[in-house]
């Protein structure tokens, strides 16, 4: 039995590696990490999206490729090897999985095609579910979220943010809501963005609030 990547997956991986080798040198990545290459970072991001990585986990009926997680793994490996400063895991892996598994048909129709067309970017915060902290937590009541979420991935420049609470309930909020405050956290890897999200009476959509929500959050 063969346990390696398929020819298609290797091809996608090679495209990403080649793009980064041609467009993201160590010096350029260093500038981005030091906050000196905003336009450069945008150009790299736009170029990577032209390879279609944002469509991998979007079902075909929502204008995506309908590929599997191994395709995403292949891309993630290539981005890691090239130190690509791309918000891939939040917007284009975890968000599509959460919406596809936990969203209503209306939510799927509204969000998934816009991820595929790069109209929307998502931040995602699952840290409260996988490792809650005493000084943080979110509470949901009357369709509102309040509280503090830590280590939210890819929240910077996102349009929406997906958050999980301690029970594994998953919620979706507009990042531009007046009750949302986003603070960047300092981490070791400056090519990745993690944030603290402060929430005050923020309108929230329920993405998964069922007896099976734990399974969706785990995935």
Regions found by a protein language model. Give the residues of each.
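Amphipathic, small/basic residue-rich leader segments at the start of a protein or domain
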Residues: 1-89, 110, 114
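N-terminal glycine-rich flavin-associated loop
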Residues: 84-105
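A short core secondary-structure module
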Residues: 125, 148-181, 185
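Cytochrome P450 C-terminal beta-domain/meander region
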Residues: 132-146
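Glycine-rich beta->alpha junctions and the first turn(s) of the following alpha-helix
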Residues: 2-8, 12, 81, 181-219
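A short, Trp-centered hydrophobic/proline-enriched beta-strand micro-motif
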Residues: 117-129, 163
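A generic, well-ordered mixed alpha/beta core segment in the N-terminal half of proteins
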Residues: 101-121, 145
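Long, well-ordered alpha-helical segments
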Residues: 16-26, 105-107, 142-145, 168-179, ...
């Amino acid at each position: 039995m063969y346990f390696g990547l398929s020819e298609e997956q290797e091809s996608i991986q090679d495209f990403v590696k080649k793009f980064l080798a041609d467009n993201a040198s160590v010096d350029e990545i260093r500038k981005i990490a030091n906050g000196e290459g905003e336009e450069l970072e945008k150009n790299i991001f736009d170029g990577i999206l032209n390879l279609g990585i944002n469509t991998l986990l979007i079902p075909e009926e929502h204008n995506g490729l309908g590929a599997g997680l191994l395709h995403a793994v292949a891309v993630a490996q290539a981005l890691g090897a090239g130190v690509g400063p791309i918000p891939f895991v939040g917007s284009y892996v975890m968000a599509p999985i959460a919406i596809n598994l936990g969203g209503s048909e209306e939510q799927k129709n509204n969000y998934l095609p816009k991820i595929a067309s790069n109209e929307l970017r998502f931040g995602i915060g699952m840290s409260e579910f996988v490792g809650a902290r005493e000084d943080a937590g979110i509470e949901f009541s009357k369709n509102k979220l309040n509280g503090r979420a830590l280590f939210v991935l890819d929240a910077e420049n996102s349009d929406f943010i997906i958050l999980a609470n301690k029970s594994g309930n998953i919620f979706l909020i507009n990042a531009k809501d007046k009750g949302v405050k986003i603070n960047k956290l300092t981490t070791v890897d400056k090519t990745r963005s993690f944030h603290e999200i402060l929430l005050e009476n923020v309108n929230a959509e329920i993405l998964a609030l069922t007896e099976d929500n734990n399974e969706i959050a785990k995935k």
